[in-house]
């Protein structure tokens, strides 16, 4: 029995999970090595260091399955160097990377969340698809690009070593964060260094802060796993509870389960800050900003009271990819709802084949649509905006919003967190399919009624016609 196996027995954690955690924690000493010995070396030397370390981490976690990222690196090189700027390159990227991932899901799909080579490969999939799209943008005329595309467009094709380093960078190859090649190049070129060309010491405190926050979330998640195990929702003890308490326990379990993602992102971000990748320029006062690869905005995630706050605070890297590389490129559809549906379907497919993934994103779509319709009603109804803007109203609005998104997301996450239909169908039935009923039956009907019965601001008087103005003059 190896060291990891012994630790697995002592901690009751799976060996695969321990290997992943050790690899993520290794990002801190590796960051120290980079900022001590490699930060001012030529790009090729840094790339070689990243490739060697990244392959080692993959082998430590996945063994011979390291062949999968290697094949994808060669695929990315071929597409970006021999198909750059063509529509075919976008199709090829999805066939080569997303297709590769989906085949992996097909052969490794089980009833639980298993950590296999597909776990880190899903990160590489989006990174390389984004790379191909950025190279595609770089081949277009600048005047045809949107502002966000100009920031990430790559006009000079990356070489094989740079692509390998980009995909295998030790602080992003296993659990994220997502970042673009332009961001990676800025880091390798030393744009994050201080005026003396040295790694800024201002990275230390933010790095430690994110690490400690990640550890806190990890402890809370582990405590939650023992307190509310997944099996509880198919037990007699759960089914004998009242409807309110069944839904409340689901909501609490959802929050505690999400903390494992929060923990890994925060710990990884801390290491990214220490290495310099997290540098994001300077603020208005000239201080270094270290939120360049932020995946979790803690305060907004914990205190936000609408669905916008969730999207803006949680899994920011993937959400940014979806916004810039999928949603905004669907402008030709000329329909915001259709673009939203396509984007969420894309993310569901990226997660895998389980029905629950698609239902989760479906409920999310219903929630966001209901929120947008409610906001539109508030804006058009006289006195409503004024009433909720009063200080005395704010606490009640926050409580209502926080409970609404927490309970709605808790219901939806049942179908994601319990994975297999045979595990989540019982708990969903016990909640009487409440999320689907509210957002796809009750609210649409109520919205149509409110549109007809609520008063609205009077339309502004039409501007006088030029001819009429002349007559009056």
UniProtKB/Swiss-Prot annotation:
Entry annotation: catalytic residues: 315, 351
Molecular-function GO term, any one: 1-acylglycerophosphoserine O-acyltransferase activity
Alphabetized InterPro entries for the sequence: LPLAT_7/PORCN-like, MBOAT_fam
Pathway entry: Lipid metabolism; phospholipid metabolism
Enzyme Commission number(s): 2.3.1.-, 2.3.1.23, 2.3.1.n7, 2.3.1.n6
Membrane topology: Multi-pass membrane protein
TM region(s), chain numbering: 20-40, 43-63, 66-86, 88-108, 341-361, 396-416, 431-451
Sorted UniProt keywords: Acyltransferase, Endoplasmic reticulum, Lipid biosynthesis, Lipid metabolism, Membrane, Phospholipid biosynthesis, Phospholipid metabolism, Transferase, Transmembrane, Transmembrane helix
Major enzyme class: transferase
Motif (Di-lysine motif): 470-473
Pfam families noted in UniProt: MBOAT
Reactions mediated catalytically: a 1-acyl-sn-glycero-3-phosphocholine + an acyl-CoA = a 1,2-diacyl-sn-glycero-3-phosphocholine + CoA; a 1-acyl-sn-glycero-3-phospho-L-serine + an acyl-CoA = a 1,2-diacyl-sn-glycero-3-phospho-L-serine + CoA; a 1-acyl-sn-glycero-3-phosphoethanolamine + an acyl-CoA = a 1,2-diacyl-sn-glycero-3-phosphoethanolamine + CoA
Biological process terms in GO annotation: lipid modification; nematode larval development; phosphatidylcholine biosynthetic process; phosphatidylethanolamine acyl-chain remodeling; phosphatidylethanolamine biosynthetic process; phosphatidylserine biosynthetic process; positive regulation of growth rate; post-embryonic body morphogenesis
Gene Ontology CC terms: endoplasmic reticulum; endoplasmic reticulum membrane; membrane
Subcellular localization(s) per the UniProt record: Endoplasmic reticulum membrane
Family statement: Belongs to the membrane-bound acyltransferase family.
Function: Probable acyltransferase which may mediate the conversion of lysophosphatidylcholine (1-acyl-sn-glycero-3-phosphocholine or LPC) into phosphatidylcholine (1,2-diacyl-sn-glycero-3-phosphocholine or PC) (LPCAT activity).
Domains as described in the record: The di-lysine motif may confer endoplasmic reticulum localization.
Protein name: Lysophospholipid acyltransferase 5
Organism: Caenorhabditis elegans
